[in-house]
Amino acid sequence: MIDGAGKSTLLNLIMDKLTPCRGSVSRHGNLRLGYFTQHSADTFDLRLSATENMLAKFPNADDQEMRSFLGKFQIQGQDSVKPMMMLSGGQKSRVAFAALAYQKPHVIVFDEPSNHLDMESIDALVGAVKDYRGGIVVVSHDEHFMSNTCSELWVVGDGKVSRFRGGFNEYKKDTLEKTRKRIEQSVKLLSNINK
């Protein structure tokens, strides 16, 4: 993924935060979208427990229902009732993902979800995403996260979004080969200039 290629613009169009300059964006009127970023866990009051935070977001739920729901995301027992400041980064991310999943979105858009997370936290998030039964759209530079959560690869660049036929390893090989060819062309141009 190349910075400045238009990934954020694409996500903002998907999330209806931007209007396209030309063309259109169509979505079903009942489509529920969720949005998960590297900062999603920062929205909680860390003095409160995961259960208390969830109940604050969803006041129509009861304590037992929320604890049971959090358990589906491996936030169980004491972890669900102790202050969130005592949870690991991965646990906080799982609580954030649980809060998002509780809203039952059809599709969750992930914007660099693993930035600033350690491997244990990334693996915890990967596990939660694998258990999710809706659609996902991921924008990430994290090969490990993408390889373990995505079944299709779409490339953003040159003002287009196109499906890449193959997995992440094939994409890397293809990108390296294109880069190698560009470097060879540049070297030839420079050598011709220096003659």
Which residues are covered by each model-predicted region?
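ABC ATP-binding cassette signature C-motif
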Residues: 1-195
